[in-house]
Amino acid sequence: MIKFKNLGLLEILVFLSVLYVVVMLIWTTLTREGVLEKVNSIKLNHKNVVELLNNEINKCSQSPEIKTSWGENCDSTWSSTLIVEHVLKNIELKNPYSIKTPLIQTASDPRIQAEGKAGQSTDKGVIFVSSTDFASEAGSEWIVGTCVKSPCVAAGNNELVSIYR
């Protein structure tokens, strides 16, 4: 039997450190599934928005005289605000983090918002799209970015896609 009164400060510190590591490993194991579920929901939201835009681009490249699903002419510049409003009204976005703000928003630079650079605070689960309108010229770029888990700047913790017309 170990006599606790004979344990020194170093032994107690080692014991507490080992205990802390074991508790953290157990906690990580128990919560991993919930985190993965949230991450997958956010990635699905991101994918649905990107697919909507790509489908509209493909539809409009085949028939430039028709209108987009949000009501703009295919051959004109597309309003980022109208696209965001259309997504909010017509695509079911899952909200795993109970975010109070809209799940898709415009940002001057979605990369900064999705990666959390330059001290920007980011919202996990929010899809950020370029606030500049999507120009009608061939090769015009529009960026869609999402932070899926903290820290957003870490590899694999964000989704960034450039969409071209």
Question: What is each residue range found by the language model?
Answer:
Residues L44, N54-I57:
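Juxtamembrane non-transmembrane segments of integral membrane proteins
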Residues F4-V50:
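Amphipathic alpha-helical segments typified by the pilin-like N-terminal helix
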